[in-house]
């Protein structure tokens, strides 16, 4: 090693200079590839001249195991030290993919967006990686490397959720509900109401119904049951044998029906305190609340003619 280091230091520009025969290209560094494989691949692509020189520089810097996988774009020839720096910092040279997931998006819907933005990721791959975390993939705008895979995208979204939920830790603890129940409730609220005030009202009503042992009777679960963005349930649907059918089964559904935003999570943790047990959205676009079924029916006749 000392002899090799001396050769590199003595050779100076000769050993660190880019090779002849360079052409603009993309080079894919596979996840888990050894420093030997990476060095040889770059040499074969005429990005570097001497594989051993790259290995020695990375070893001297303590970066042999810090090479970042992904697709690197080389537009102009670069010296060895610049190439080493790019490998370690993940400077891919390719504009990142910008992708936005809206509040209330399901993993199934996210998978379609990811597949459209990343040719190398199928909707099935993303669904498999993301489905166990339905409700915990925070809806937001993200920037990802073009070489990102389903697992890394899911990991970034989960990390964002964990960071965002910290702002509600006190409210969640004070609510007396588990994080799991809060997320499930928030996913229902996300689909049932739009404004912050309405979300807090709906959350309060649904918690009230749970406390009284009443079925939640939330219509939005049927979109999740049937895998559709929107769905108006029929009388037959109200009897469909699904654990997510909140007409047929009391209590919260077994899991979230979408990935809620922070507004809905906050509403679930800190709902409005009322005696209401019913709500509906009228043709006037407003929500109307009732304490009794008779009042609810009156609202139905008045606002849903």
Description of each model-found segment:
Residues 17-167:
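Signal peptide-directed extracytoplasmic domains
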Residues 4-6, 26, 170, 279:
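N-terminal hydrophobic or amphipathic segments with adjacent small-residue motifs
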Residues 108, 112-305:
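Bacterial extracytoplasmic/cell-wall-associated proteins, especially those involved in peptidoglycan
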Residues 9-12, 81-82, 236-237, 267-268:
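Short, flexible segments with low predicted structural confidence
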Residues 1-24:
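N-terminal type II signal-anchor transmembrane helix
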């Amino acid at each position: 090693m000392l002899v090799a280091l001396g050769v590199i230091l003595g050779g100076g520009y000769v050993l660190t200079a880019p090779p002849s025969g360079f052409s603009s290209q993309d080079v894919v560094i596979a996840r888990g590839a050894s420093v030997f494989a990476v060095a040889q691949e770059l040499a074969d692509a005429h990005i570097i001249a001497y594989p051993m020189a790259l290995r020695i520089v990375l070893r001297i810097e303590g970066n042999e195991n810090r090479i970042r996988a992904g697709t690197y774009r080389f537009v102009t020839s670069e010296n060895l030290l610049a190439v080493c720096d790019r490998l370690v910092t993940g400077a891919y040279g390719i504009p990142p993919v910008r992708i936005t997931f809206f509040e209330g998006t399901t993993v199934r819907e996210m998978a379609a967006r990811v597949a459209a933005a990343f040719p190398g990721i199928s909707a099935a791959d993303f669904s498999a990686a993301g489905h166990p975390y339905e409700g915990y993939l925070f809806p937001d705008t993200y920037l990802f490397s073009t070489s990102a895979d389903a697992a890394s995208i899911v990991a970034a979204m989960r990390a964002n959720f964990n960071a965002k939920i910290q702002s509600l830790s006190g409210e969640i603890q004070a609510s007396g509900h588990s994080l799991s129940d809060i997320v499930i409730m928030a996913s229902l609220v996300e689909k049932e109401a739009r404004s912050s005030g309405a979300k807090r009202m709906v959350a309060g009503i649904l918690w009230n119904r749970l406390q009284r042992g009443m079925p939640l009777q939330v219509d939005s679960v049927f979109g999740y049951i049937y895998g559709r963005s929107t769905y108006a349930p029929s009388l037959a649907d109200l009897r469909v044998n699904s654990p997510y059918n909140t007409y047929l089964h009391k209590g919260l559904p077994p899991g979230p029906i979408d990935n809620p935003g922070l507004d809905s999570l906050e509403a679930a943790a800190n709902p409005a305190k009322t005696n209401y047990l019913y709500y509906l959205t009228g043709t006037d676009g407003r929500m109307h609340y009732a304490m009794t079924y008779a009042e609810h029916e009156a609202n139905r006749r008045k606002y849903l003619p």
